[in-house]
């Protein structure tokens, strides 16, 4: 009895401490797509509408190239960008944008398709550490207080990795004491777990043994996979952790499809083929989990979306629906009260802003956001954008610098406010970041902070 009581007290204390930590971090945005990686913030007290010229500007700053979003935690903002021939990890005061420290290392990355040469992955922040993954696959752990290197792994040298299309762009996942990275190594190092404190390899899995001989589900004739040593594995989606039927899953939307792994051992739970028919294609949307279902989507060559239902044992999935109502390129939908709010379309002329019922795949409403790319004048449309949810409002960043505020309304596309952010132009492909009532927007050359606090 004493043992049971003592255990109960220990669990209660642990829960209490955990609740305190959550409360302290509720206004933070310490990793890609927010504290829970779901494009949502728990903040309230935000402006209900914006002036015509936009909300109050706090500060703005010229930054280097890249698509990496800033992360904010414990009074620190960290941006990963490239200046000339160096990738720079820069810690700033989130209230002013002033530099606190920088950490630099050489980079020779050149994008083969002409996009910018900066980092694509977003920093992960803890109380005392910062983890970054560069465009060439250099993985660093840096001290948050002084910006000094703690450890480094050069994944391109440590693993056999075919060159990625647009550089390394899958932000790692910190799960307990493991840093889980979609490395993309051959033949079976598609996903690698590193010890977060030391950088040592804990486990590696996914590759030839996962896909070789599998049917290419959804392809005409459903041919079998014949694995090649030059197969690219890493996608531009980031690993997602989820608890389904009481079991913890690491969900990785690889270039070939979705794989679920046990976070402790790396053992596969299940996999599902999901890839466009042509080589020049990518998967870039993070999986979205609701209950025992998982949504995956892509925009290349009519692949569309699939909702998968996980079996109670957690070792298999079945298709619930397959639809082209959402064809998502590089953004991740916001799930709110059973509906998905997202930008659909591969290219600028295909762009739509849509609401889709997650359980059925039914298109609820559709708004045309298509435009023809031009550098002469900013478009009035959002194009392909990103959205986050806070205070029952959707904050939308269009790819040419249009910033919008929407009500998440399944009845209609209810736009509250909209304005063109000065000095931001195409391509604005970085999702907005919200922390302590401050909105941070990043383009290829600017970092801008707005105050969204309601007076």
Regions found by a protein language model. Name each.
Residues 10-23, 367:
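Bacterial N-terminal signal peptides
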Residues 24-455:
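Noncatalytic, solvent-exposed loop/strand surfaces
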Residues 1-13:
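Bacterial N-terminal signal peptides that target proteins for export
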């Amino acid at each position: 009895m004493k043992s049971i009581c003592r255990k109960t007290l220990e669990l209660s204390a642990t829960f209490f401490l955990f609740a305190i930590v959550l409360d302290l971090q509720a206004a933070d945005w310490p990793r890609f797509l927010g504290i829970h990686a779901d494009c949502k913030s728990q903040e309230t007290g935000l402006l209900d509408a914006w002036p015509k010229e936009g909300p109050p500007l706090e500060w703005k700053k010229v930054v280097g190239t890249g698509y990496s979003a800033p992360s904010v935690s414990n009074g620190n903002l960290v941006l990963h960008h490239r200046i000339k021939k160096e990738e720079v990890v820069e810690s700033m005061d989130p209230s002013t944008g002033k530099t606190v420290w920088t950490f630099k290392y050489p980079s020779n990355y050149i994008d083969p398709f002409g996009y910018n040469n900066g980092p694509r992955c977003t920093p992960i922040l803890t109380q005392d550490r910062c983890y970054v993954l560069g465009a060439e696959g250099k993985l660093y752990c840096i001290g948050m207080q002084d910006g000094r290197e703690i450890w480094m792994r050069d994944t391109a040298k440590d693993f056999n990795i075919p060159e990625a299309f647009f550089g390394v762009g899958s932000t790692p996942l910190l799960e307990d004491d493991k840093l889980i990275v979609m490395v993309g190594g051959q033949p079976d190092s598609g996903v690698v777990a590193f010890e977060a404190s030391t950088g040592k390899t804990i486990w590696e899995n996914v590759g030839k043994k996962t896909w070789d001989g599998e049917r290419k589900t959804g392809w005409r004739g459903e041919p079998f996979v014949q694995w090649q040593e030059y197969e690219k594995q890493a996608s531009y989606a980031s690993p997602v952790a989820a608890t389904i039927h009481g079991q913890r899953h690491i969900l990785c939307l690889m270039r070939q499809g979705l794989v679920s792994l046990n976070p402790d051992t790396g053992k596969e739970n299940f996999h599902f083929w999901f890839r466009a028919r042509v080589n020049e294609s990518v998967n870039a949307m993070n999986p979205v989990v609701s209950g025992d279902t998982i949504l995956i989507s892509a925009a290349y060559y009519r692949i569309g979306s699939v909702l998968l239902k996980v079996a109670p044992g957690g070792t298999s999935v079945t298709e619930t629906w397959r639809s082209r109502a959402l064809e998502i390129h590089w953004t991740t939908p916001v799930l709110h009260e059973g509906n998905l709010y997202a930008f659909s379309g591969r290219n600028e002329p295909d762009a739509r802003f849509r609401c889709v019922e997650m359980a059925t795949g039914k298109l609820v409403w559709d708004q045309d956001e298509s435009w023809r790319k031009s550098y002469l004048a900013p478009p009035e449309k959002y194009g392909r954008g990103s959205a986050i949810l806070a205070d029952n409002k959707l904050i939308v960043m269009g790819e040419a610098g249009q910033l919008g505020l929407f009500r998440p309304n399944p009845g209609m596309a209810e736009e509250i406010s909209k304005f063109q952010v000065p000095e931001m132009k195409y391509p604005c492909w970085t999702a907005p970041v919200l922390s302590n009532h401050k909105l941070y927007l990043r383009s290829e050359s600017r970092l801008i902070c707005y105050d969204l606090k309601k007076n």
